């Protein structure tokens, strides 16, 4: 079983903890990581073009005038394409870019990404990460203590002081453990986790 040092907020070693090999020290399957990132980015896309056809335009269900006896050409609906305000015939529609990935593969991709960073010594575990007040300066001080840049901070539950302190720091993201995803893991150079977040991640990814 893999082990990792546990530090306090001042980077003083306070102990060690065992890590699940299945989650943090497994095989790195790069094709799964690539697939998961591709799915995430595709699902963020939204089509920006789209017009209403005659089925989508409101109103016009009633026949505008009777079929015969008026001397005009017969009409069935005032929302036909040749009417002003009618639907567009064969107009452009928004494309759906959504892709899917089954749950088992998504979990395996997250495990692979975590294992990759663990093997590259880019994971740091803290016993806790609580700030006494909202302080960007205090949070930046923690990052400098650990000598990390472009960092993903993973916590187990909402931490208002930490989240507000970090929100204006460039290349830093605070994420709750249940929202952990492959794209964020590979986007950042380093990951800082709390002990409780590690256990929460292991519980979610081992099941």
UniProtKB/Swiss-Prot annotation:
GO terms for biological process: translation. GO terms for molecular function: rRNA binding; structural constituent of ribosome. Signal peptide: none annotated. InterPro entries: Ribosomal_uL4 (IPR002136), Ribosomal_uL4-like (IPR013005), Ribosomal_uL4_dom_sf (IPR023574). It holds the Pfam family Ribosomal_L4. Keywords: Ribonucleoprotein, Ribosomal protein, RNA-binding, rRNA-binding. One of its GO terms (cellular component) is ribosome. NCBIfam families: rplD_bact. PANTHER family: 50S RIBOSOMAL PROTEIN L4, LARGE RIBOSOMAL SUBUNIT PROTEIN UL4M. One of the primary rRNA binding proteins, this protein initially binds near the 5'-end of the 23S rRNA. It is important during the early stages of 50S assembly. It makes multiple contacts with different domains of the 23S rRNA in the assembled 50S subunit and ribosome. Part of the 50S ribosomal subunit. Belongs to the universal ribosomal protein uL4 family. This is Large ribosomal subunit protein uL4. It comes from Geobacter metallireducens (strain ATCC 53774 / DSM 7210 / GS-15).
């Amino acid at each position: 079983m893999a082990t990792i040092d546990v530090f306090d907020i001042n980077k003083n070693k306070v102990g060690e903890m065992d890590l699940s090999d299945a989650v943090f020290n497994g095989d790195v399957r790069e094709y799964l990581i690539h697939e998961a990132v591709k799915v995430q980015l595709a699902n963020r896309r939204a089509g920006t073009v789209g017009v209403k056809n005659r089925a989508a335009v409101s109103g016009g269900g009633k026949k505008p005038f009777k079929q015969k006896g008026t001397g005009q050409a017969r009409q069935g609906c005032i929302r036909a394409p040749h009417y002003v305000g009618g639907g567009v015939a064969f107009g452009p529609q928004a494309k759906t870019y959504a892709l899917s990935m089954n749950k088992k593969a998504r979990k395996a991709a997250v495990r692979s990404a975590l294992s990759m960073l663990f093997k590259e010594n880019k994971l740091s575990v803290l016993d806790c990460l609580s700030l006494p007040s909202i302080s960007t300066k205090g949070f930046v001080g923690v990052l400098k203590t650990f000598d990390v840049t472009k960092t993903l901070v993973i916590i187990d539950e909402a931490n208002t002081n930490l989240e507000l302190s970090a929100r204006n720091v460039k290349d830093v993201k605070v994420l709750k453990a249940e929202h952990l995803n492959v794209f964020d893991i590979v986007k950042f150079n380093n990951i800082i986790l709390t002990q409780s977040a590690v256990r929460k991640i292991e519980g979610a990814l081992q099941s």
